[in-house]
Amino acid sequence: MTLRGRTVTLEPLSAESHTADLWKAVRGHDELWTWLFDSPCGTEADLRRTIEEKQAARGAVFLAIVPAETGRAAGWASYMRMEPAHGVVEVGSILFSPSLQRTTAATEAMYLMASHAFDHLGYRRYEWKCNAQNLPSRRAAERLGFTFEGIFRQHMVIKGKSRDSAWFSMLDSEWAARKRAFEAWLEPTNFDGEGRQRQGLGQIAAAQD
C-alpha cells in the first residue's frame, strides 16, 4: 500500500529501507516516545528492532511518512484495530519527528490515510484514541475533524502506569465535508511564498458548515 500526495508519500514501513533515515530524524528526541507504547530507542539497532516488530505486527499496517521535500522518512503512522465486518478502523501509533511536526506534509499524511480508509477501503467509522493527558494529540484530533466521544477511564496500563483514553471518531457520513476542507486547505494557493498557510484547516471547515 502506497499513498501519494502533493507533499508526502506514505509507504510500507521497512527496517531495511527506513531505519537509517528515521534514526537521523528521531535521535536524541526521547520526548517523542512519551505517549507511545514503545520505549525510546537508544541506538539505531534498537530502532531497527522496533521497526521490525511493527512490520511483523498482526492486525496493524504501519506506513512510513516520507515528505517530498527531502525524500527521507520522517515518521510513521498505522491503521490499527481493523474490523471490516463492522466497518471500523483506527489510525494510531503516530510518530512525527521534529522535522515533520506542524508541516503541510504531516497534515496531508493524515488526510491520505483518512481518504484511503473511507474512499478505497469503505470503512464507516475512523477512530483516533490517545492518552487523555496527551493534550497535543487531542488538539490534533479535533483540528483534523474528529469528534470527541468521551474518556475511557482506567482503559489501559502502559509502561506500568494506568491510562485513561480519550476517544474520537469520524464517520463516513461526515467524510465528504471533511474531505472538502482538507482539499481546500491543501491547495497551493492556500500557502504564501514561504509555505505559511493563509487559512487554517479549522477556519476552512467552519466556513463550509
For each predicted feature, which ranges?
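Hydrophobic residues within well-ordered alpha-helices
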Residues: 140-141
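GNAT-family acyltransferases
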Residues: 1-103, 116, 120, 161-176, ...
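Conserved beta-strand-loop-alpha-helix junction that forms the acyl-donor binding cleft
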Residues: 128-137
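Glycine-rich acyl-CoA binding loop
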Residues: 106
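Conserved GNAT acetyl-CoA-binding A-motif
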Residues: 119-129
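Conserved catalytic-core motifs of GNAT/GCN5-like acyltransferases
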Residues: 147-161
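Flexible ATP-lid and adjacent glycine-rich G1/G2 motifs of the Bergerat
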Residues: 113
